[in-house]
Design a protein with these regions (language model features):
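Conserved alpha/beta-hydrolase "acid-adjacent" motif
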Residues: 184-190, 202
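Catalytic histidine-centered segment of alpha/beta-hydrolase-like enzymes
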Residues: 211-227, 247
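Catalytic histidine neighborhood in serine/cysteine hydrolases
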Residues: 197-217
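Gly/Ala-rich beta-loop-alpha elbow adjacent to hydrolase catalytic centers
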Residues: 9-17
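Short beta-strand immediately N-terminal to the catalytic nucleophile in serine-hydrolase-like folds
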Residues: 7-9, 38, 178
């Protein structure tokens, strides 16, 4: 898609995005100008949430035996192993049942009062919140093992087709990480950990931002996204039209001649 690209990843994709750009950098390929990582588990050991604890306290086999199903007959992809969308949805709702109950009760009251604006805002939110997709089983299980159990990226043990994933090889891609102050899915510091891994990017080409009062969804949707987060993303991309400054020390001409 060309070199003039800025990549944004939200939640789970932050890890494969960082992995892909690391491999591109190691291979000497043209990499994106910047990478924006939002609310993702780069280092899931930091400030573990209920999501992290579940993944760490259950075995790989438990997930394979309890949340993986085959698509029924008469549906597209029949027979394919997936982590079903309805289970994902049930899991998210179960994390904050009181909040969802209150939200729906308030929605009912708004309908009675004729408060159409608040009622419509509720419908828009849940139209997105309830939109789930069956996830390929191998992708889901690989994520559980690599990200939440083995911590392969931060420990430096992750390899792709025999090639080690080395974030320290990234030099020309600027890095912006974004976290929500109240995020109960990706805890504080999990996304910011990318800065500790990307040591080849100069400090002036790296930035971390915490959205005050924002939960997980607030950093990429709704008012807090529009008013707090989007301006930061916009300005960061505009400030790095040619990529990042490298943190690698440059040899002076005399040193190059001596070499």
């Amino acid at each position: 898609i060309g070199p003039e690209v800025h990549v944004m990843s939200v939640c789970q994709p932050t890890v494969p995005v960082l992995g892909a750009i690391s491999l591109m950098a190691t291979a000497g390929e043209i990499a994106p100008r910047s990478m924006i990582m939002m609310g993702g588990p780069i280092d899931a050991r930091k400030s573990p949430t209920a999501v992290n604890n579940l993944a760490m306290n259950k075995s790989y086999a438990w997930f394979e035996n309890n949340v993986i199903y085959r698509v029924p007959a008469n549906y597209p992809g029949a027979g394919r192993r997936v982590y079903p969308g309805f289970l994902q949805h049930a899991g998210f709702v179960a994390m904050n049942p009181d909040r969802h109950f209150t939200s729906h009760y308030d929605y009912f009251l708004n309908l009675i009062r004729g408060d159409n604006d608040d009622a419509e805002a509720h419908r828009r939110f849940y139209d997105e919140y309830n939109a789930v997709l069956d996830m390929d089983a191998d992708y889901y299980l690989d994520t559980i093992k690599l990200v939440f159990q083995d911590f392969g990226l931060v420990k430096g043990t992750w390899t792709v087709q025999g090639q080690p994933v080395r974030p320290q090889d990234i030099h020309r891609t600027a890095l912006l990480t974004i976290e929500g102050e109240l995020d109960d899915i990706s805890g504080a510091g999990q996304t910011e950990a990318a800065h500790d891994l990307c040591t080849g990017i100069a400090a002036q080409s790296r930035q971390h931002f915490v959205a005050e009062g924002a939960g997980h969804y607030g950093i990429f949707s709704g008012r807090r996204w529009r008013e707090q987060v989007y301006p930061v993303v916009r300005d960061f991309i505009a400030a790095h039209p040619h990529g990042a400054a490298s943190a690698r020390p440059r040899k002076n001409p005399a040193a190059r001649e001596a070499a």
